Amino acid sequence: MSATTPAAAAPKKPFYRVLYIQVLVAIVLGVIVGWLWPEIGKNDWIKALGDGFVKLIKMVIAPVIFCTVVSGIAHVSEVKKVGRVAIKALIYFEIVSTFALALGLIVANVIQPGAGFQGQTNAAAVANYAKQASEMKSVDFVLHIIPDTVVGAFAQGEILQVLLFSILFGIALMSLGERGHTMRAFVDDAAHAIFGVIAIVVKAAPIGAFGAMAFTIGRYGPQALGNLAGLIATFYLTALAFVIIVLGIIARIAGFSIFKFLTYIKDELLIVLGTSSSESALPQMMEKLERLGCSKPVVGLVVPTGYSFNLDGTNIYMTLATLFIAQAMNVHLSFGEQITILLVAMLTSKGASGITGAGFITLAGTLAAVRPELVPGMAIVLGIDKFMSECRALTNLCGNGVACVIVAWWEGELDRDKLRAALDRDIDPSDVEVAVTTG
């Protein structure tokens, strides 16, 4: 991939045309509308604004993954490199995920947000989540990665299935050598067109953020917080500490600042905050990481895989919420049981990836495996899960972004000049052209 070149001659955008400012204003307006006029906020048409934007983004996720992975692998000289990147990514995911799970346990034990909580459990309210959790099996998860048909994988937007086919297709194209030149050029050109579609769709981000936030506040409202505000605050502060301290230290080891990195991805963070979906920023995130200096093969392999195997925010939530429920129900968990929770959560957090309500399903699976009597206690946190999902999504996005840069650095596939240029100067991505090599 050729070097990024800032469009230095382009005039600076007026502040009201900057995406992150538009999204931020939209979020604030959404909160105001949902709070002051909840009946308007709960309107199906308002909800459709947020849902529609997320669907528009999901529409291009599979093509983005396919083109990025195939183009990246097809230009690699050897298959070993692909395997090496995948192994390093999985090692990183497991280490950092363990840190996230452990942090949730430590904070819950120290602060004890559920101690003295007065609330009611409701087994019926969480019966569906418990049922789905009981049906989760590791072998089913592995088999689910293999699509029944290639068309079905793309049609249903199954990230891991699309990723598997893309890797195989990229390796096959790489093995063709010069005979595959025309197809490589086609995929590269298709990538440009797809990212052009994304540039159009992202312009609707403020509308989507407004609709999603207005509905969330209008539907659940501040009254949904009640005496669970302590748990929400604990989770948000714990996630913030994880990003600033844990990811910050990891970033510093690789030679970049976590604060500059967060500034660089501010547009994506605000889109995720507004939509409560980390997938809503996946295509833009992949494009930005390439501009940051990460090689195309690393971005194509690490980011989509991370959306299933590197869910730092979800991991923190699982252990923190588990202990909160136990404390609220006056159930003591021994040190051994807490270690078991950590080990079980490492498995269940992968088993429900891509499933709607995955955070709650994995929580049910973890509780059922360790102390089944705690499953009805999930009803305590059911009402605030929408507010928690925003923090989970934000933390997951930060974790996957840092993971990609770290794996690229570890593999020697990180362009330091691009990294410094993007972070130190905070180049506006819309003022940068990315050229993809076709040969």
UniProtKB/Swiss-Prot annotation:
Pfam families: SDF. Belongs to the dicarboxylate/amino acid:cation symporter (DAACS) (TC 2.A.23) family. It comes from Bradyrhizobium sp. (strain ORS 278). InterPro entries: C4_dicarb_transport, Na-dicarboxylate_symporter, Na-dicarboxylate_symporter_CS, Na:dicarbo_symporter_sf. The keyword Cell inner membrane applies. It comes from the Bacteria. Keywords: Cell inner membrane, Cell membrane, Membrane, Symport, Transmembrane, Transmembrane helix, Transport. It is found in: Cell inner membrane. GO terms for cellular component: plasma membrane. The gene is dctA1. Responsible for the transport of dicarboxylates such as succinate, fumarate, and malate from the periplasm across the membrane. GO terms for biological process: L-aspartate transmembrane transport. The chain crosses the membrane at residues 18-38, 56-76, 91-111, 157-177, 193-213, 231-251. This is C4-dicarboxylate transport protein 1. It is a multi-pass membrane protein.
